[in-house]
Amino acid sequence: MKDLLNFLKAQHKTEEFDAIKIGLSSPDMIRSWSFGEVKKPETINYRTFKPERDGLFCARIFGPVKDYECLCGKYKRLKHRGVICEKCGVEVTQTKVRRDRMGHIELASPVAHIWFLKSLPSRIGLLMDIPLRDIERVLYFEMYVVTEPGMTDLEKSQMLTEEEYLDRLEEWGDEFTAKMGAEAIKDLLGSMDMHAEAEQMREELETTNSETKRKKVTKRLKLVEAFIQSGNNPEWMILTVLPVLPPDLRPLVPLDGGRFATSDLNDLYRRVINRNNRLKRLLELAAPDIIVRNEKRMLQESVDALLDNGRRGRAITGSNKRPLKSLADMIKGKQGRFRQNLLGKRVDYSGRSVITVGPYLRLHQCGLPKKMALELFKPFIYSKLETRGLATTIKAAKKMVEREEAVVWDILDEVIREHPVLLNRAPTLHRLGIQAFEPVLIEGKAIQLHPLVCAAYNADFDGDQMAVHVPLTLEAQLEARTLMMSTNNILSPASGDPIIVPSQDVVLGLYYMTRDKINVKGEGMYLSGPAEAEKAYRTKQAELHARVKVRITETVVDEDGNSTTETKMVDTTIGRAMLWQIVPAGLPYSIVNQKLGKKQISNLLNEAYRKLGLKDTVIFADQIMYTGFAYAALSGVSVGIDDMVVPPAKYTEIAEAEEEVREIQEQYQSGLVTAGERYNKVIDIWASTNDRVAKAMMANLSSETVVNRDGEEEQQESFNSIYMMADSGARGSAAQIRQLAGMRGLMARPDGSIIETPITANFKEGLNVLQYFISTHGARKGLADTALKTANSGYLTRRLVDVAQDVVVTEHDCGTHEGVDMMPHIEGGDVKVALTELALGRVVAEDVLKPGTEDVLIPRNTLIDEKWCQIMEENSVDSMKVRSVVTCDSDFGCCAQCYGRDLARGHLVNQGEAVGVIAAQSIGEPGTQLTMRTFHIGGAASTAAAENSIQAKTTGTVKLHNAKFVVNKDKKLVITSRASELTIIDEFGRTKEKHKLPYGSMLSKGDNDAVTAGEVVANWEAHTMPIITEVAGRIQFVDMIDGVTVSRQTDDLTGLSSSEVTDPAARPAAGKDMRPAIKLVDEQGNDVMIPGTEMPAHYFLPGKAIVNIEDGAEVGIGDTLSRIPQKSGGNKDITGGLPRVADLFEARKPKEPAILAEHTGTVSFGKETKGKRRLVITRDSGVTYEEMIPKHRQLNVFEGERVERGDVIADGPESPHDILRLRGVHAVTQYIANEVQEVYRLQGVKINDKHIETIVRQMLRKCTITHAGDSEFLPGEQVEYSQVKIANRNLEAEGKEPARFERELLGITKASLATESFISAASFQETTRVLTEAAVSGKRDDLRGLKENVIVGRLIPAGTGFAYHQDRQAKRAEAQEGPSAEQATDNLAALLNAGFSSDE
C-alpha cells in the first residue's frame, strides 16, 4: 500500500531544470492549461456545500472534493482511480489536483492586459508609438481609431472622435474601417510587421541628429527587438481568454452560522463572469451599440481589477469598504508570495524559549530543557522505541512518550548524543546569528547559553528568547557540525578578529587577578613555578597581587612545528603565575605578564588562534572563562556611592568658568562680540572646563598613595571598584564616570544644538529640577532615535544583501594583473590604519620591490599573512598593489585570489563561499550602532579652531607632492598650486604624516629638507584666500574704476586704504562687462610673462576681493596682490552615521557637488551670462571645452592655470559618478571605501575593506555602450558589464571590432532591480514593473544567484550546494556526450570536501 502511494506521488515529478523563462501566453496556451471553461459565476450550493456545475468551484473542471470519490458518490475508493463518472463527469483522483488544475473563461470581447497598458512605460503605447492617453480613450470607448484607411486620406492608427467618425462615414462610406475598444488595438498590433519596424528605426537612428529623438527611437527599437527575439506576439498583450486560478488557491470555507469566508479573487472572478455572460447575451440579442459598448467597457474594468486592482481608477471594494486583493497584490510586498512564502518559511521541529546563562557549559554545548528536547526529537524517539522492540507500533510509541515512561528518557539521551541543534536569535543580522551546539539535557524550562557566544548573538539575559531548530538529515547534521558549530566560528567574518571574547565579569575577574599591589603579604618571594605560586596563595602565605619572582618554562614553536623549551626567572605576581597554568604551550609568558584588560585578552586569544590553531584556542577560551568567573566572585568588586570621589578642584574650576562667561556676556553687551561668537565662546569654555574636571577626577580615582617596604610613600593604581571596571573594559567608560563624579556637562536639544547652560552637578550630588529637565531632552531623543535606527539599518542590510547575493567565489584564479593600490591611511599627523593591517589577507597583484632596490621582496600572487606583514614592517614597505574583487575578471561571481583570505577561517577563501552575502551582513550588522543624526556644527563640535599651520609631529624628511611654488624675498617657499600635499617620511621612507597644503601657504622647509618633531613647517591665513604673483614688477590696475568696479574704504584708526572689488551683480550698468585685474609690467611698461609660458602675468580679481596695494607699486615674487575673504568653512551640516552610509551606497549625487575638470589643459574664462561664468579649458591639442558654472561657486583656479583631468575646480562634496567618469574605477572604489570606513571608524567598528569593495563591484556591474563596433548592442544602451566582456572576447577572437563602453555606477537599489535575474529583482521591489518588463522581453533566468534558487526551492549554488551544482552540470555534459561507465558517486563526503576545507 505504502509503495503504491509513493508510486502515485512520483507520477508528477518534474524533470530537473536549469533556467526559468517568462513570456506572454498565447490564447491557445491558456486553453491548453485549462481543464474546462467556467461558464457560471456560482460557487457552491449553500445547502449541500457541493460545488455548482460549470461554476467557479466546479468539480468536473477542477477535480473531486474528496480523495478518490466522485461528486455524486457513484465511484469511491482507489480501485476506480482515473475513471470519469458518467453521471457527474468528475474524474476519480486525489483532491490535491484542485490546487493545480486551471480553468478558463472565453471572453466575449478582447480585453487589454492592464500591466502592459499602465505599467510605465506603457508597453502597448511604446510599441504602437501612440500616447497612453489616446490608447486609453480607445480602450474605454471614448474614441475611434483607424485600423484600415483604405483609399481615404486617413492614416493608419489615427484617432477620431465620435463626430469626426460620423462625418468621415458620410464622406467615404465603408472605404475605411475604424473601431474602438480592445479589438481595435488588437487589430493594429496584429498588423504590425516587427522586422520592417526594426529596419525602419535603424535607418532613423543613423539619419537623425536630435538627441531626444534618438533616445525615444532606441527605447522603441529595444522593445521591438525583444519581441522579435523572444518570439512573443504583440497581440498577446490583449487577452481573449482569461485563465482561472485553481480553486484551492482561492478557497471558500464555510464558517459556523451559515456564513462563508472567501478569497477576494472569487468576488473579482464573479464580476468578470457576470459581465462576460451579460455581454454574450447582449451580442446575441444584437442590442444597441451604446449598451454593448458600455458592457464591454465594464468587462475591461472588471478584468483590470482582477489582474491589478487599483492600478486604474478607483479600486473595487468589498463589503467592508476595503479594496479587494487582486492577483498582483498576491505576489508583491512584504506579505506577498515572494517575501512571505518563498524567501522565508516557518519550519517544523523548532521551538523557542527564554535564555539564561550556562557558565559551566563547554563552548560547543547548550542547555536544552528536557520538555523541549522530548518534543523536538519525537520522530527519532519513536523510531528508536520501535527498532528496540519496546513499542510495537508508532501509536504505542506515541502513548509511551505521552506517559513519559522512564525508558523514554534513556532513549532521549541516546538520540540526542552528538546530534547538534541550531540556536538562532532574532534579529539575525549576520551569519553568527545562527550557530550549532550539542544539546545537554537540563531541568527547567529555559535554554542555557554559553556566555562567550553572547557577543556573536548580541544576546543578554534580560528576557531574550531564542529559537531551537533540529537538523534532520545526516547531511544537515554534518554541515551543522563542520560549518556551524560555535567552536568553528571563533573569528568575526567582518574583520577577522576573534568574536569569542570574554566580556564583563570574566574581564573583571582576569583584570583583578593580574593586577599588582605594592607591599602586601608575600612580596619578594622566590617561587619554583606556577604550582608553588598557587600553593602559596591557597595557604595564605602570599596575596594574589603580591610581586614575586617565579621560574617559568616557555615553549617556542617555530615555523616547521618543532618546539623548544626555555626556562627563566620572571618578575611577576602570584595571580599571573596562576593564570599561566591554563595558557596553552606555544605562547610567550610576556603575553600574560601584564594587567589584562579586554583588549589584551582579545589579543591573547587572537595570538592563540594564529599560532596554535582552533582546538587549543577553544579549550583555552573555556578555561579563561571559568577562571574569570571564579576570580570575579573572589574579588568582591561592587559599586558603592563612596566609590565615586568628587575632586575638590571641581568647585574652583566651575567658579572660574562662570567668571569667564560673565566677562564674555559683558563684552557682548558692550558690542565687542556678536551673538554667535558669544555662544560659541561660552560653549568652548564649558567644554574645556568639563574636560579639566574630568581629568582631575580620573587622576583622583586612578591612583592612591601607599607605603612601600622601605617605608617610603609611593603612588600605585587604585583598586577603586568603579575605576577597575572602566579600566579593564568590563563595564562603563571614562565618560560615564565623569557623569557620576565629575560634572554632567553640556546637553543637546533634540535638534542637535547645544544648550549653553551646562549641568554642573553630577549624579552623586544629584540634579536640581531645571538640570533634570534639561537632561531628559537628550535622553528622550536618544530613545526615539534608536527605534528609527533599527528600521533604517534593517532596510539598508536588505538592499545590500539583495545587490550582492549572487557574488560567490566561482574559480580559483581569474588571471588578472589588475588590482588596487594600497597605502596606509594617514590623517594629519597620525597613521590611522597601517599598511600591514590593510594588506593582511590580500593577494599581491604585482611584485613588491624592496624599497630603494630592484629586488623582489614579495612575489606576485602571494597571500599576505602575519609572517609577510612582519617582513613588510622590517623592510618598511609603504605602498603595494593588491588584487581586489572590484578588478576581478571572473564573468560570474569572483575568484579566490582576488578575494584573498576568508576572514572567519584565516586561510584563502574556498570556492563556493557566498562572499557577497557575507559582505552585506558585515556592513549591515553594525548599522544599528551608527548614529542617525546630521551633526550641526556649533558649540562643542566646532571647538577646533580653523587650521592655519602645519606642525610636524614626527622627525623625518619633508616631501612635496604635485606642488608648484615660488621663492619670495624672505627665502620662504610660497605654494601656487591647488591640490598640493606635504608628507613627512621617516628614515625608512615610510610616510608618517600627510597634510593638505592650501594655495598661498608659506613653507619654512623645502622638498627633501630634514625636520624635527614640533617644528612648524608651513603656515597660511585661515580666513582669506590670497592671489600671489609669480613674477616681480610694477603693478598696473586694469578696469579698476572707483565707484564702478571697486569701492575704496579707509580705516579710521590706521588711515590705511583698501579697495574692494564689487560683485558683478551689484555693479552699475557701465561696469557689467568690465573685468578688474592687476597686471605686472617692467620698467618700460611692457607686460611681464609668467616664467616658462607665453602668457602675460594678468591676475583677474573675482568679486569681494580686497586689494591693499596702490597702482604703480613695486612687488616681488611671491607677494600677495589681493585677498579674497572665504566664507568661514564648514557651517554646513555634516551628514553622519547611517544616512551617510546609505547615501554612499545609493551613489546619490550631493546637492552642490564639487566641479571637476573634464579634461587636462589650461583654464581661461569666457563671456559671462547673467548667473553663470563660462569656464574654458584649452587642451594641449588646442581643442577647447566649455562649461557654465554658477557665479556663487567659489573657484579654485585662476585664469591661465593648468589643470589635470579630474582636478577639483570648485569645492564641494564630490559626486561618485564624476569620480568614476574622470578618474576611473580605482578612484571611485577608494572614495566609497574611505568614506564608509570614516563613518564606521568613528563608532569604533572594524570592517575589512574587501566587503565594501564587493558591494562596489556590484554597483559597477552595468556599463553604457559608447560605440557598438561589430557587436549586437545599440549605442547608449545599458548592458551588464560581464555580457560586454564576453561579447568583446568573442568578437576579438573572430578579428572583428569590439564594442566600446563606459562603466556606470548604480546605487544599490537600482543595481538590485537591474540584475540579470528577474526572479531576484521581482522579489526585491517594484514587482509589477519587473515582471512586466521580463515577460515582454521573454527573459530567461539562469538561476545563478542565491535568491532565485531559494525561491524555486533548489540547493543554493554556494557552500555545499556549489559542489552539488558543479557535479550536476558535469553529469549532464556527460549524459549529452553519452553515459560513461562509472557514474560519479554522489557522495556527501566528497561534496563536503570539495566545498570546504575546515581546520578540523
Curated annotation (Swiss-Prot):
List cofactor names only.
Mg(2+); Zn(2+)
The free-text note explaining how the cofactor binds reads: Binds 1 Mg(2+) ion per subunit. Binds 2 Zn(2+) ions per subunit.
Which cysteines pair up through disulfides? They are none
Enumerate the residues binding Mg(2+). D460, D462, D464
The Gene Ontology biological process annotation of the record reads: DNA-templated transcription
Q: In which residues is Zn(2+) 2 bound?
A: C814, C888, C895, C898
The keyword Lipid biosynthesis is annotated on this UniProt entry:
no
EC numbers: 2.7.7.6
Name of one Pfam family that matches: RNA_pol_Rpb1_3
User: What SMART domains does the annotation carry?
Assistant: RPOLA_N
State any GO CC term: DNA-directed RNA polymerase complex
Name the top EC class. Answer: transferase
Q: Where is this region: Disordered?
A: 1367-1400
Q: Which PANTHER family match?
A: DNA-DIRECTED RNA POLYMERASE (PTHR19376), DNA-DIRECTED RNA POLYMERASE SUBUNIT BETA (PTHR19376:SF54)
Could you say which protein family the record assigns here?
A: Belongs to the RNA polymerase beta' chain family.
Briefly, what is this protein's role? DNA-dependent RNA polymerase catalyzes the transcription of DNA into RNA using the four ribonucleoside triphosphates as substrates.
Q: What is this protein called?
A: DNA-directed RNA polymerase subunit beta'
User: Which species is this UniProt entry from?
Assistant: Vibrio campbellii (strain ATCC BAA-1116)
Which gene name belongs to this protein? rpoC
